[in-house]
């Protein structure tokens, strides 16, 4: 029989990141997400929680649009970073 030791470092607190999602109305929703999880999961959860359609809003981080396939690791997000949410503007004429 071989002794199985628990593998250290597999589950670390660094696997997760706390992110804030700030709406235009001043509301802030916090999420805990894995660094390598696509942000689409967070986006969909935010929309469900706020009663919004994902097609009606845009998510931005540091002024740059976020794609559904982006991950916190790819965007070099750090703990407690904030994602901004904007209503998509439609139409408009002079």
From Swiss-Prot:
GO terms (BP aspect): protein sumoylation
Main location class? cytoplasm
On whether Nucleus is a keyword of this UniProt record, the answer is yes
For this chain, the Swiss-Prot or TrEMBL PTM comment says: Polymeric chains can be formed through Lys-11 cross-linking. Cleavage of precursor form by a sentrin-specific protease is necessary for function.
Q: Where is this cross-link: Glycyl lysine isopeptide (Lys-Gly) (interchain with G-Cter in SUMO)?
A: 11
Q: Which Pfam families match?
A: Rad60-SLD
Give the location in the cell.
Answer: Cytoplasm; Nucleus, PML body
Indicate the cross-link positions, Glycyl lysine isopeptide (Gly-Lys) (interchain with K-? in acceptor proteins). Answer: 92
Q: Which GO terms describe its cellular component?
A: cytoplasm; nucleus; PML body
Q: Which residues form the propeptide?
A: 93-94
Residue ranges occupied by any Ubiquitin-like domain in the UniProt entry: 15-92
Which GO MF terms are attached to this record? protein tag activity; ubiquitin-like protein ligase binding
Alphabetical keyword list: Cytoplasm, Isopeptide bond, Nucleus, Ubl conjugation, Ubl conjugation pathway
| UniProt-listed InterPro entries | Rad60/SUMO-like_dom, Ubiquitin-like_dom, Ubiquitin-like_domsf
What function does the entry list?
Ubiquitin-like protein which can be covalently attached to target lysines either as a monomer or as a lysine-linked polymer. Does not seem to be involved in protein degradation and may function as an antagonist of ubiquitin in the degradation process. Plays a role in a number of cellular processes such as nuclear transport, DNA replication and repair, mitosis and signal transduction. Covalent attachment to its substrates requires prior activation by the E1 complex sae1-sae2 and linkage to the E2 enzyme ube2i.
What is the similarity comment for this entry? Belongs to the ubiquitin family. SUMO subfamily.
Query: What binding partners and quaternary form does the record give?
Result: Interacts with sae2 and ube2i. Covalently attached to a number of proteins.
Q: Which PANTHER family match?
A: SMALL UBIQUITIN-RELATED MODIFIER
**The protein, known as:** Small ubiquitin-related modifier 3
Q: Specify the species.
A: Danio rerio
The record's gene field reads sumo3
């Amino acid at each position: 029989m071989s002794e199985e030791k628990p593998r250290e470092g597999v589950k670390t607190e660094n696997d997760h990141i706390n992110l804030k999602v700030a709406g235009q109305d001043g509301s802030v929703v916090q999420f805990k997400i894995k660094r390598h999880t696509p942000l689409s999961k967070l986006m969909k959860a935010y929309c469900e929680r706020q009663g919004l359609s994902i097609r009606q809003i845009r998510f931005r981080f540091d002024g740059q649009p976020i794609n559904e396939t982006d991950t916190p690791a790819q965007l070099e997000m750090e703990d407690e970073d904030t994602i901004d949410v904007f209503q998509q503007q439609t139409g408009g004429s002079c």
